[in-house]
Amino acid sequence: MLNPIVRKFQYGQHTVTLETGMMARQATAAVMVSMDDTAVFVTVVGQKKAKPGQDFFPLTVNYQERTYAAGRIPGSFFRREGRPSEGETLIARLIDRPIRPLFPEGFVNEVQVIATVVSVNPQVNPDIVAMIGASAALSLSGIPFNGPIGAARVGYINDQYVLNPTQDELKESKLDLVVAGTEAAVLMVESEAQLLSEDQMLGAVVFGHEQQQVVIQNINELVKEAGKPRWDWQPEPVNEALNARVAALAEARLSDAYRITDKQERYAQVDVIKSETIATLLAEDETLDENELGEILHAIEKNVVRSRVLAGEPRIDGREKDMIRGLDVRTGVLPRTHGSALFTRGETQALVTATLGTARDAQVLDELMGERTDTFLFHYNFPPYSVGETGMVGSPKRREIGHGRLAKRGVLAVMPDMDKFPYTVRVVSEITESNGSSSMASVCGASLALMDAGVPIKAAVAGIAMGLVKEGDNYVVLSDILGDEDHLGDMDFKVAGSRDGISALQMDIKIEGITKEIMQVALNQAKGARLHILGVMEQAINAPRGDISEFAPRIHTIKINPDKIKDVIGKGGSVIRALTEETGTTIEIEDDGTVKIAATDGEKAKHAIRRIEEITAEIEVGRVYTGKVTRIVDFGAFVAIGGGKEGLVHISQIADKRVEKVTDYLQMGQEVPVKVLEVDRQGRIRLSIKEATEQSQPAAAPEAPAAEQGE
């Protein structure tokens, strides 16, 4: 029989329910987690045996949103969910990052976590629910996992931290921060903020970590009740003799190699040392495992770099702990793009462009929480040549999507509001060289490219990656880490922001015991680095250009009477289509009567504005207009008087004598002066040529207010 084991608890303003034992009983563990009607079903399957020769930990996290959760049918051609969206990929990474460091060293059995969103309350984001579910399922499974973890979202509204704010509350919040950690320590932070201070950000991390303890306690209680026996897994015994033999052959040589400051040269030398060491040892004993020797050598490398940093010696490339690599900043490097920049920091380089488009270029995202439009796009590309390798080139991988989102978060806080700058903006960062922190180089490059494009960003932003090496109570925080320092260190800590505050913070911690004090030191050191980079960037460009690129569309905005919108659009869109073809512009009309005309040529925009003003102009009774004969009928003639408006000149109003035949007086296409006699309730216009000729001078079409140019 199905015997569900259920645990309920209050978590901030929400009620969380954990349920296991009901579904997916052939999986290693399965949990249904719900938080106020948002429910995520999370399963874990772990293989009891590792694949022979497996030398890394094969953990896969899949996060999938089902549209039935929101009571909808997919809008795709096949009416079925397809490959993961960008949002799903980012949440899969969010789940993966805090759980990965909690598996023991040497554990290489395959583990797969699948989180499926099966019900959604539009006010409760499923990401936190999925993270709690993954933590609970892994803890129940018996797989060696040093959890559980808790997860919390923290907002900052009216100078107060808010635990797990609703979607509506998030719109008012100056902060959107997700923090995950164990009972003892924070493991991961992912956030965007509206330029908050270091203390405010650190306070949010600490607040979120304290509040999530209730989740950890309840998962532990559930494990006592429903957990599976812990696997009897033991790491391979350490071969001390072999370790000593490898160290004797390679340690001194590797130590020397890590004094080579050039990355390519250093890599080449390290490869030579490793292959010579392995060849020597295999010649002595053919039964040795090459993979095992590689792992021992990697551990020696790690130890060499870490012990040198902790001893206060210069880093791999000769820098002190808080030194930034040499910077080279250039703007306007590509002639036809709307804005461009080349940002180089040591051996990391990003070519960044900014492109301006109209509102119809905005991305419409059909998400589970509802449809939304994004007018700021940020795409990050990491080609294999950037690290001197060959490889596949194609659609973006998880890492590229994640780095693009982080860089976007870094810039978002300074982007202008749509009503001040009515453009869709796309930033693309091409990483042309990489040795550490390419996502933060993308933030710096984006800030420069946006200024070069004339986008009125509120402030320049820069980003920096920090690292940490910690042994016991001894620790060193490193500024502007290299790729090697990232792999061999204990923390990766990326901070982006302006002179006034932080716009994005991302932290991944690989060890336990990172205290509030260490995070404080890292944040303060990052601020110094950020201000240094901003100083160099400001020498290249210190404010957005006064004008947008001549190749970018200029958006002119005019207001019309909302009642006249139907006249500008016409039947089935006929008038607006004809207008765009005639004037060579893009025209967008909003419900409140705001009309946006986009054109690369100012004359075309003026022509479009003039035509719209003609169409929407009010017809004045008693006024004389110059019109054109469009139709001749037995009882008179129809005359167009501009703006798509047409009136009837009755046969009795053509001349001041009796008219037998209209065509004796009027021809098709003939221009004639006409006086407006009447506009009836249906908007029908009565005209007179007879009375117009009595008045000497015809009037032009009525004037409308001049357009303002949105630049």
From Swiss-Prot:
It is an enzyme of class 2 (transferase). Keywords: Cytoplasm, Magnesium, Metal-binding, Nucleotidyltransferase, RNA-binding, Stress response, Transferase. The keyword Amino-acid biosynthesis does not apply. Its main location: cytoplasm. GO terms for molecular function: 3'-5'-RNA exonuclease activity; cyclic-di-GMP binding; identical protein binding; magnesium ion binding; polyribonucleotide nucleotidyltransferase activity; RNA binding. Residues 327-331 are annotated as: Interaction with RNase E. Changing residue 444 to W: Abolishes enzyme activity. GO terms for biological process: mRNA catabolic process; response to heat; RNA catabolic process; RNA processing. The keyword Lipid metabolism does not apply. Mg(2+) binds at residues 486, 492. Component of the RNA degradosome, which is a multiprotein complex involved in RNA processing and mRNA degradation. Interacts with RNase E (rne). Homotrimer. The homotrimer forms a ring-like structure with a central channel, where RNA molecules can bind. RNA molecules bind between neighboring subunits. Might interact with YicC. Involved in mRNA degradation. Catalyzes the phosphorolysis of single-stranded polyribonucleotides processively in the 3'- to 5'-direction. Also involved, along with RNase II, in tRNA processing. RNases II and R contribute to rRNA degradation during starvation, while RNase R and PNPase are the major contributors to quality control of rRNA during steady state growth. Contributes to degradation of some small RNAs (sRNA). This is Polyribonucleotide nucleotidyltransferase. The gene is pnp.
